[in-house]
UniProtKB/Swiss-Prot annotation:
GO molecular function terms attached to this record: 5'-3' exonuclease activity; 5'-flap endonuclease activity; DNA binding
GO biological process, one term: DNA replication, Okazaki fragment processing
SMART domains the UniProt entry points to: 53EXOc, HhH2
Keyword vocabulary terms for this entry: DNA-binding, Exonuclease, Hydrolase, Nuclease
Family matches, as InterPro entries: 5-3_exonucl_a-hlix_arch_N, 5-3_exonuclease, 5-3_exonuclease_C_sf, DNA_polI_H3TH, FEN, HhH2, PIN-like_dom_sf
Short name of any one Pfam family annotated for the protein: 5_3_exonuc_N
Residues covered by the 5'-3' exonuclease domain: 172-270
Function: 5'-3' exonuclease acting preferentially on double-stranded DNA.
Name of the protein described by the UniProt record: 5'-3' exonuclease
EC number(s) from the headed UniProt entry: 3.1.11.-
């Protein structure tokens, strides 16, 4: 099994780990009583990356924009199941950005563009320049981005996800993960999917037909497949074609967002890894 080992560009799914850090260390405060758990958690993640990749030279953290995106226009219920950012987390955003700037780590937020789309577009942009990319995220949407040169570091499971691992676990190619999510939906992002189609059925259909388009081109064949409740599944697909195609558009990460980032912009300063927690200690005691 081959995975990226030497000097990759690290792209961190900042918003995902910002929330995870906030809830993991929600009671942590500095000496002035200001909340700092999210900051601590993010810096801890970065520090662990420095320890894992001792010769790390290129890193960038991508954050979501607060503005609505094209997906909200396509589907007004998109991510509507999520609550607004807690005030105690909002208070930590600006200090975190200031600390990351002092450390020398580039951050990027593009107004009106989701972090997933920025990560996808930047990854493919850098891949075209001959770079190897390691995306730090445990968001399953990211699996569609995996190529020979783009891997996912799943921090929760402490493993690197390659095309081979996706094929072994799901039996589908990374790019087919979009169709998979479109069929079964994604409760996390409120992507509807097709009613009554779960993981096993979605994987069966993708294995058989590869994508949504081929499924609907062969819709009359589905009722005869060796699949439990095949006739009902065929009916569900017919009755929910627009919903399936909408879900595909919602699940598909954009790869063509223009991003004005040069490789030199994300190269670390030599002092960076030694500086990480010293700067945090200064904030903690302020």
């Amino acid at each position: 099994m081959n995975h990226i080992k030497n000097n990759p560009v690290i792209i961190i799914d900042g918003s995902l780990y910002l929330y995870a850090s906030y809830y993991a260390f929600c009671n942590l405060e500095n000496t002035s009583g200001k909340p700092c758990g999210a900051i601590y958690g993010m810096l801890k993640i970065i520090d662990n990356i420095f320890k894992k990749y001792k010769n790390l030279k290129k890193i960038i953290i991508i954050f979501d924009s607060s503005r609505k995106t094209f997906r909200n226009k396509l589907f007004k219920e998109y991510k509507k199941n999520r609550s607004s950012m807690p005030d105690l987390l909002v208070m930590q955003i600006q200090p975190l950005f200031e600390i990351l700037k002092k450390i020398g780590i580039k951050t990027l937020t593009i107004p009106g563009i989701e972090a997933d789309d920025v990560i996808g577009s930047l990854s493919y942009q850098l891949e075209k320049q001959g770079e190897k990319i390691l995306i730090l995220s445990h968001d399953k949407d990211m699996l569609q981005l995996v190529t020979e040169n783009i891997n996912i570091f799943h921090k929760k499971n402490n493993c690197i996800i390659t095309s081979e691992i996706i094929q072994e676990k799901y039996g589908i190619k990374p790019k087919e993960f979009i169709d998979f999510l479109a069929l079964m939906g994604d409760a996390t992002d409120n992507i509807p999917g097709v009613p009554k189609i779960g993981i096993k059925t979605a994987l069966f259909l993708i294995n058989k037909f590869s994508n949504i388009e081929n499924i609907y081109n062969n819709i009359e064949k589905i009722k005869s497949l060796p699949l439990r409740n095949a006739k009902n599944i065929s009916i569900q697909l017919k009755n929910n074609k627009e919903r399936a195609l909408l879900s595909y558009k919602l699940a598909r990460i954009k790869l063509d967002i223009p991003i004005d980032i040069k490789l030199k912009d994300i190269i670390l300063k030599k002092y960076c890894s030694k500086n990480t927690f010293q700067i945090f200690k200064n904030y903690f005691s302020s």
